Amino acid sequence: MENKKLIERCETELAKVDRPGADKLLAYIRKSDFYTAPASTRFHLSCPGGLLQHSLNVLDALRGLLDWNEGTQEWEYRVAGHVVDSTSDESVIIMALLHDLCKTHFYGTSMRNVKNEETGVWEKKPYYVVDDKMPLGHGDKSALLAGKYIELSCQELYAIWHHMGYSGQDYSAAQAIDHSILKYPMVLALQTADMMASKLLEDNEGNRFDSAAALVG
C-alpha cells in the first residue's frame, strides 16, 4: 500500500478522536517524521514509512483481539469467554496509533560500506541509527507526548506507558506492569497486539501479508 494511502487511513482514524486538542495532535504528527520514519533500525519495518505502517498494523491487531459489542458500542477484551476489560473504538485508536509516538524525532541515518555481490565493488549505503532528540524513555515518552495535546483516560495512559511489556525491566518495574495489567487488562491487549504486529505481520522492508493494515470499520 502506498504511503499516501496509509496517511489517509491514519488521518481518517484519528478524525474519529473527538477530544479537545485532537487538531493540535494531528498538527504535531504532520510536522514530525511520523509518516516517514522507520519502525526500527534493523528489525521490523526498518524502512521509510515503517512507523506509520506499524501503528496501523497494531490498530488492526488490537481490533482483531477484541470483540465488538453492538449493544454497548464498545470493544470487549475476553479471556476464556470472560469479559475482563472493555473500551471505546476511540480509545482503541488512541492506544494503537499513539503507542509509538515516542519514535518521532528518534531515528537518523548514517553511511556504511556494503559490498555489491554482483560487481564485487564496495558501495556506500545509508542505514538507520538511533538519534533520540527527546531522550525521555519509550512508552512513557509516548504517553507524555500524547498527553500534551489530548487528555488520556487512565486505561489509555497505562496501556501506552507499559506497551513494551517486560522487555528490559527490573523487578520493581515488572511489578508495576503486573499491577497495571490487573488494574487495566487492556494493557496486556496492547502489548499483545504490538508483538503480533512486529513479529507476525511485519518483515524488515514491509508487511508479510498484503491484507495487513487494510481498511477496517
Task: Please provide the spans of the model-predicted regions.
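Non-catalytic interface/linker regions that flank or bridge core catalytic/transmembrane domains
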Residues: 1-41
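Amphipathic alpha-helical segments within well-ordered protein domains
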Residues: 11, 59, 63, 143-147
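Divalent metal-dependent catalytic cores for phosphoryl transfer on phosphate-bearing substrates
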Residues: 40-47, 71, 78-209
